[in-house]
Amino acid sequence: MTNIKRIQRICDANGISGFEDAVLEVIRKDGAHLGSFEEDSLRNLYLSRTQNQEGKPTVLLDAHTDEVGFMVKCIREDGMLEFIPIGGWVTTNIPAHMVRVQRRDGSTIPGIVGSKPPHYQSEAERKSVPDISSLFIDIGASSKQQAIEMGAEVASPVIPEATCTYNPETKLLFGKAFDCRLGCSTILDVMEDLQEETLDVNLVAGFASQEEVGCRGAQLTARKVNPDVAICFEGSPADDTFLPPYQQQTIVGKGPMLRFIDSKMITNPRFQRFALDLAEKHQIPVQQGVRNGGATNAAALHLSGQGIPTIVIGIPVRYAHTHWGISSTEDVESSIRLARAILSNLSEEIIAGF
């Protein structure tokens, strides 16, 4: 079942792509009772279920640990920090938000993303989208030397400032990094729920790094685990606030979205149908999506080795790749139920049919 406190711990941790250490620390603590951990040099974290037995097919449960953010490019003489985006951002979503500039020791400096005020903008500037190079981070330093003394430096990771909160009346979560820390938390919940159950498959969780910059971690996890099938958990961008109802396929509160296609993968139709049939049988709400954009770690997983049958369980996230997202714990719970049903019914014979 959904663990709200766990979601908050994992989502609040600092961890832009390449700097996921704090996230891994939380996952290690929360999952210590579920099996044994391994880690590689790219900061991928592997959790092998205690009950795994030789000779059974292996299922990789994938979710990425990194979040979108920024990195300090240089420090101006006036103490302002210029930066580059890490992951996909829409420039208009960046200014006037608070950020955390991470020091070497892991502590952070609060800052605000600044831009030229409208009072000083030309008419053309007011009508155009600002270039990210025109933005800067203000940490309150009045000189380059002061910024350095405060702990800022070239290549400092910069994390969106947001603390995960939960509204029990609406069952909605508000916070950062739902893409895909919700998946990380869901995997732990699933493995916890299945602790006492005998399965016909082995489970290995792959908490992958650097998804937001090109699914890099998943390329390693696929090779190391060499699974027979994979389930990729993702925070999928919700489309329910801007598309007409007949086009909406990722609605917050209506269950996880299982995509048939995106820009990098055509989902294995047999594994997909297996999952959808189980959802119908167990009355688990799900949504079906046909995406002509976007991609997930499944892009790397399904092409590994001789090919890995892979599906994506996408938890809807409004305003993904911004400081604040909105997701429903009902969708998280439905994702947990669906994953449990899939894993409880998988066998060597069924996998061979994919």
What are these regions (language model features)?
Residues 1-354:
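N-terminal hydrophobic/helix-forming segments and targeting peptides
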